[in-house]
From Swiss-Prot:
Gene giving rise to this polypeptide: TPS1
Domain notes: The Asp-Asp-Xaa-Xaa-Asp/Glu (DDXXD/E) motif is important for the catalytic activity, presumably through binding to Mg(2+).
Protein name: Zingiberene synthase
Coiled coil: none
Function, in words: Sesquiterpene synthase converting farnesyl diphosphate into two major products, zingiberene > beta-sesquiphellandrene, and five minor products, 7-epi-sesquithujene, sesquisabinene A, (E)-alpha-bergamotene, (E)-beta-farnesene and beta-bisabolene. Can also accept geranyl diphosphate as substrate, producing nine monoterpenes, with myrcene, limonene and alpha-terpinolene as the major products.
Positions bound to Mg(2+) 1: 295, 299
GO cellular component term of the entry, any: cytoplasm
């Protein structure tokens, strides 16, 4: 079968110049609050947690219940009340709802689908007039409908139409709204509520909630303390992984890679934000570091032969393989093996077996990289975007990170779950397709100036003889299809714990955030302010 041709230099990628770290050793000098301060914060938070629990238990009216649970989720407090919220969700699912109240119906639909209940979207047909338009001009109701509609699956035309209708009306009304509602509408038009990274939403929402006349003071204080305690934990983790990163001697041995250890932790914290996932975040950050280094070596720096040698060494995971590597790779490779050993110690005797999966994930990654090296050197473009994705959805690294997140989790993740994840189930295929397409839209122009293999964008352009603009527009549609695919699988009952699907969706949210406007990981100045809010600036009382 004849290969399509794409012009790039064979044998050696042209290394780009990445901007240096924006944070340097900043977090190495992090000083946590004094022990008495920390103890006070935790004790006060425990008291407030129980006070809020009484509020959660005592709320029974449907409108108040919907508002309460959504507020708890946005404040980052819902994980403290999982049992109570599950009971309330069961009640909400089995309760009748005023089918004439668009806001109420939308909030109920949003909350139930967000928590895995496969409720029908036909309920929204009740709000369409004889012309097929939604019969409402209330902005709050339209905003709720807009956010609810993004939990759509394939074939739900009423939700597709709802997004078009509400977006048009919300955009038209934006300039005439009072500032608080205008800000909320503007934010939703940029990123619908369901797709926001949860911990970043919490950091942004707490100051907004503080301005609400109807706010609950106990919930507000608990939310602030809860976030600030989490921020302390994040900074301690970041101090640990920064010290680990320094041992790689990036400045001398790997000066050409993206020096982004802070951004790596930031990304992983977005996917696994809760305190109980501390070990998972640390392991994930280290895996992200290895994936970044491998990507930058093989994709943009090494010769073809050097890249293949490194891929073979990763596949062996043996100290002997280090002997044939170029000098600049040797320390990195041995450090990789040393980190695998330390991960076994961190996981403990009952979970050390899980490091096998980290190794297997990197082996899968470099096999894909080897295929892409051949594409680059042979000037090859796969004939269809589907054939491209067979390889490129694996090499984007999202599969490796999503699976790695479960290695550091508790007993709820069994060996059977990890084995199942390695089979590359459909949910992970949909997720990694989404990340690959999102990545390619933002990075293709930059990468094609550096002798990179053809991306899915170039593949689509050549397959359909179209322009880059048209290809990107089409791929945006495929990205929306990937969200629908993920949502359908998210709502489909499986033998796996619901934490698996929830975590994959959380990773999708981080991918949407990092690739929404640019490649924010590579050009990390675009997220520096948000990183400061998450790590450096506590929420004031």
């Amino acid at each position: 079968m004849a290969a399509l041709q794409y012009n790039c230099d064979a044998g050696l990628a042209k290394a780009p110049t990445f901007h240096p770290s924006l944070w340097g050793d900043f977090f190495l000098t992090y000083q946590p609050p004094t022990a008495p301060q920390h103890v006070y914060m935790k004790e006060r938070a425990e008291l407030l947690k129980e006070e809020v629990r009484e509020i959660v238990k005592g709320t029974n009216e449907l409108p108040k219940l919907l508002d309460l649970i959504i507020t708890l989720q946005r404040l980052g407090l819902d994980n403290h009340y999982e049992i109570e919220i599950d009971e309330h969700l069961h009640f909400i699912y089995n309760s009748s709802c005023d089918v004439k109240d668009l806001n109420l119906v939308s909030l109920r639909f949003y909350l139930l689908r967000k928590n895995g209940y496969d409720v029908s979207s036909d309920v929204f047909l009740n709000f369409k007039d004889k012309d097929g338009n939604f019969a409402s001009d209330d902005i709050r109701s339209l905003l709720s409908l807009y956010n609810a509609a993004y939990l759509r699956t394939h074939g739900e035309e009423v939700l597709d139409e709802a997004i078009i209708f509400t977006r048009r009306h919300l955009e038209a009304a934006l300039t005439s709204l009072e500032s608080k509602l205008a800000d909320e509408v503007s934010l939703s038009l940029q990123t619908p509520l369901f797709r926001r990274v949860r911990i970043l939403e919490t950091r942004n929402y707490i100051p907004i909630y503080e301005m609400e006349p109807s706010r609950n003071e106990a919930m507000l204080e608990f939310a602030k303390l809860n976030f600030n305690l989490l921020q302390i934990l994040y900074c301690e983790e970041l101090k640990t992984v920064t010290a680990w990163w320094k041992q790689l001697n990036i400045e001398t041995d790997l000066s050409f890679i993206r020096d982004r250890i802070v951004e790596m932790h930031f990304w992983m914290a977005g996917a696994c934000s809760e305190p109980k996932y501390s070990l998972s975040r640390v392991i994930l950050t280290k895996m992200t570091a290895f994936i970044t280094i491998l990507d930058d070596i093989i994709d943009t720096h090494s010769t073809t032969e050097e890249g293949k040698l490194l891929a073979k060494a990763i596949d062996r995971c043996s100290q002997d393989a280090n002997e044939v590597l170029p000098d600049y790779m040797k320390h990195f490779y041995m450090f990789l093996l040393k980190t695998f050993d330390s991960c076994e110690d961190e996981l403990g005797p009952n979970k050390r077996y899980r490091v096998f999966y980290l190794k297997e994930l990197l082996k899968i990654l470099v096999r894909g990289y080897s295929q892409e090296i051949e594409w680059r050197d042979e000037h090859y473009v796969p004939e269809t975007i589907d054939k491209h994705l067979e390889i490129s959805r694996v090499t984007v690294g999202a599969f490796q990170l999503a699976c790695s997140s479960f290695v550091g989790m508790g007993d709820i993740i069994t060996k059977e779950v990890l084995d199942w994840l390695l089979t590359y189930p459909e949910l992970l295929k949909c997720f990694t397709t989404f990340v690959r397409l999102s990545n390619d839209i933002t990075s293709t122009k930059r990468e094609q100036t550096g002798g990179h293999h053809a991306s899915t964008v170039q593949c689509y352009m050549m397959e359909h003889s179209t322009t880059m603009h048209d290809a990107c527009e089409k791929i945006k549609g495929l990205i929306e299809d990937s969200w629908k695919d993920m949502m359908q699988l998210y709502l489909t009952p499986t033998e796996q714990s619901k934490v698996v699907a929830q975590t994959v969706v959380d990773f999708a949210r981080t991918g949407d955030y990092m690739y929404k406007k640019t490649d924010a990981f590579t050009f990390s100045h675009t997220i520096k302010d948000m990183i400061a809010l998450l790590y450096v600036e506590p929420i004031l009382f």
